[in-house]
A protein has these predicted regions:
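Nucleotide/pyrophosphate-binding catalytic subdomain
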Residues: 1-104
Length: 104
């Protein structure tokens, strides 16, 4: 069975440092980008949804006393940061990317 389009959901922790899942590990990002490029070169269209838990978890920040709405926005910004990091790495593989967000 072959697919023309796939959706890849990545936890933000998949982009993080080994052992902790925090921050952004350039080696992890490059590895994922190479794997995505390999599949894309087979003619598969790939949409990627990436989390931001490696940067900040809004619920955790809120529990520590931050305003919930701000905490949620901070978490969403983490997803954008991850998306941009992954986008750069995929473009370095010669593919075209687009980062989309609902943040206003």
């Amino acid at each position: 069975m072959t697919y023309q389009r796939v959706l890849l959901k990545l936890s933000g922790e998949a982009l993080g440092e080994p052992g902790t899942g925090h921050g952004i590990d350039p080696d992890a990002v490059r590895l994922i980008a190479r794997q995505v490029a390999k599949v894309a070169r087979l003619g598969v269209e790939i949409a990627i949804v990436v989390g931001g838990g490696n940067i900040l978890r809004g619920a955790e920040f809120s529990r520590l006393g931050g305003h919930r709405a701000n905490a949620d926005y901070m978490g969403m910004l983490g997803t954008v940061i991850n998306g941009l990091a992954l986008s750069d790495a995929i473009e370095d593989q010669g593919l075209e990317t687009r980062v989309l967000t609902a943040i206003e």
